């Protein structure tokens, strides 16, 4: 279906800065308390955010996980291999300055939300089966929990119907209620799944990361089952989606 191409992903703060690797410059990683927060240390020095701010984390669990990401770097530091560090940096560096724009970027996905598209059952029966299995319960949860009724499109349609203003208002309220940490997680999950419905369901514990992955990839999974896996393409995409959604889920839970 062509709706996947209708919206490009806005660049994250890390992407705008660039994500070039650099040599590892430290030997030891650890964590310590910083008042009511936790911080990661590299050779006993506090780790700052990319913008130079203090990386003050709300839980020991998150600090340990980010320290583990830094400890796992071998000869070179690869930012792409540290999704939790990226989320924390986004929450601290980007969102306080660009909160309204971040919310706007997330809400824009309502118009082309993955869960709103319906395949023609006669032409794509397996895609349609998976859409009904995964998307309908998420939309029902969104309607019941947040009062946002994202109407599904006609079977085979390339565009979803206009988003009801009441639904957009409800989604706006849901985003506004989130902390900066949770908004960072929602942004990542929404951009990866191309669905604010899936993102909110993941943060709301209606689905887990595995369920979010299945809902986000109904077309890809059906096509792989029919035509087979293309190594170096499908497997790479699956790994990326899996890591990003699992990281968003963990990050949201560790900052609750």
Q: What does each model-found stretch correspond to?
A:
Residues 24-33:
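Short N-terminal "domain-start" leader segments
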Residues 213-256:
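Long hydrophobic alpha-helical segments typical of transmembrane helices together
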Residues 1-21:
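N-terminal mitochondrial targeting presequence
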Residues 32-48:
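Short aromatic-glycine-(Arg/Gly/Cys) micro-motifs in beta-strand/loop hairpins
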């Amino acid at each position: 279906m062509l709706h996947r191409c209708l919206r490009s992903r806005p660049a994250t703060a890390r992407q705008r800065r660039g994500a070039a690797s650099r040599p590892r410059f430290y030997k030891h990683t650890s964590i310590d308390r910083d008042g009511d927060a936790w911080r990661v240390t590299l050779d006993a020095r506090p780790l700052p955010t990319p913008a130079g701010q203090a990386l003050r984390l709300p839980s020991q669990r998150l600090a340990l996980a980010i320290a583990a990401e830094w400890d796992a770097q071998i000869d070179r530091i690869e930012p792409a291999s540290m999704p939790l560090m990226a989320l924390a940096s986004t929450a601290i560096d980007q969102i306080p300055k660009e909160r309204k724009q971040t919310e706007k970027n997330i809400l824009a996905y309502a118009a082309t939300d993955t869960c709103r598209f319906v395949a023609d059952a006669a032409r794509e029966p397996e895609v349609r089966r998976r859409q009904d299995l995964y998307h309908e319960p998420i939309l029902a949860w969104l309607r019941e929990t947040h009062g946002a009724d994202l109407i599904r499109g006609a079977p085979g349609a390339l565009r979803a119907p206009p988003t009801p203003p009441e639904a957009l208002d409800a989604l706006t309220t849901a985003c506004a209620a989130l902390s900066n940490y949770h908004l960072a997680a929602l942004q990542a999950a929404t951009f990866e799944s191309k669905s604010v419905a899936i993102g909110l369901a993941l943060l709301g514990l209606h689905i887990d990361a595995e369920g979010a992955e299945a809902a986000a990839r109904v077309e890809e999974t059906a096509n792989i089952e029919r035509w087979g896996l293309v190594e170096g393409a499908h497997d790479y995409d699956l790994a990326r989606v899996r890591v990003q959604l699992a990281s968003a889920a963990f990050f949201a839970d560790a900052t609750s």
